[in-house]
Amino acid sequence: MRSFYDKKDGYRDTIQKGLATTRNIGNSIYFPDKSKEEIDMLKNALENSDSVVIGAGAGLSTSAGFTYSGERFDRYFFDFARKYGIKDMYSGGFYPFPDDETRWAWWARHIYFNRYVKASKPVYEELLALIEVKDYFVITTNVDHQFQKAGFDKNRLFYTQGDYGLFQSLNKRNQKTYDNEKWVMKAMEAQGFVKNENGEFDIPQDRKISMRIPSGLIPRCIDDNSDLTMNLRADNSFVEDEGWHAASERYYDFLKEHKHSKALYLELGVGANTPVIIKYPFWHMVSNNKNAKYACINYGESFAPMQIEDRSICIDGDIGEVIKKLI
């Protein structure tokens, strides 16, 4: 039997190639013209492409309504904000809570409202309607499961950075992941959240909720009784389980199959935090395939190397609004 590391690894292979490409780019960058022409060009590129590779970052989920600050945070984390001074969901994930009961109460909410509820805007569904007739594949750094919720084929998805819906053991010898849905639902009930008319947890009318879960609800590994943690890539302890490696291999095979085809590399909401996973590899693949095109839709961060300017489409704007114009 082959080990995980003998398999074709689309994740690391593309990162290495992308980094090699950036060394030749320098500061030569192409910025978009904010005109309707770019949207017409993208519509034409979609219609004439043989395949579409979607690279999705946090900006896509933000466009769909998954904001980590503002109204959503104020509604569901008002008590944590008041007591601990936490400003948003992202920074709260790093807060040194006083005990495990409080820390896991936070994470139960964080997971639930960013993984087990549906996005407030149909951006993912409209994206699927746009590309579902194409031969497509999705690579994403998002961990909120929204592609599958919208109906994308799970065999065409590669979640590189983990999944809010999975735990992993702190025992490094254990390279498995564990579904956390049942635990999350129990932990939400334990804090006093109630189901609304849509069957989703919400704040009760009296706004009385707890910032702690019972000690008996602190999650433990069913296999080795070790402490559990989130299956999110933060360091080299991140568990790349069998499903992760299978998805990486499918990504590798898809890219190889379409290496010389009329492929559209469609980048959505990828910021500066993780360009090595999607942005740089996409630039590499377009640079090395004269039949390919690169498209980038992002709010305030839409650009491409001058080397592929003639085959690049950069749109500065809200992803959801742009998709509506493309359908």
Predicted regions and their residues:
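Conserved catalytic alpha/beta core of Sir2/sirtuin-type deacylases, generalized to analogous enzyme cores
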Residues: 1-327
